[in-house]
Amino acid sequence: MFQKIDCIRFHVPDLDKALIFYREKLGLKLVWRLGNSEAGLKIGDSDTELVLVTEELEQPEIDFMVDSVHSALEKLKKIGGKLLVEPFEIKIGKCSVVEDPWNNRFVILDRSKGLLKVDENKNVIQ
């Protein structure tokens, strides 16, 4: 069901300062940027991203890539998982928030709409 860890999301109060830290100090590469609210950074040789967001998060968030959010939800509910947030549209597909039987919260998402499109400066374009 899980294909991979798509991303780990961290809250940062200032995206530009966080990008200086993670890019210049830690050497992560910018994959995409959505204005002053979000940016995705490549983690090493993997295609898992560290996503920095200015929106408040209760805790760091782990997002798992699945083939289909709806199919994954059906399976998760059958085996004791809980639906916390109904599926909703995101730029690349669908997303939902779920919880395992031990109250570990995580996100599942699919790429039913494809990858983000970016310009030469890695800014997300529509």
State where each predicted segment sits.
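Vicinal oxygen chelate
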Residues: 63-105
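Conserved short beta-strand elements that form part of the metal-binding/catalytic scaffold
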Residues: 29-60, 105-111
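Residue-level detector of conserved, well-ordered beta-strand and adjacent loop positions
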Residues: 9, 42, 53, 84, ...
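Short alpha-helical
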Residues: 16-17, 57, 70-71
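Short glycine-enriched loop/turn motifs at secondary-structure junctions
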Residues: 2-4, 54-59, 89-90
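N-terminal first-folded block
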Residues: 7-11, 17-42
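N-terminal beta-strand motif that seeds the catalytic metal site of vicinal oxygen chelate
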Residues: 1-19, 47, 60-62, 112-126
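Residue-level "edge-of-site" marker
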Residues: 35-36, 89, 116
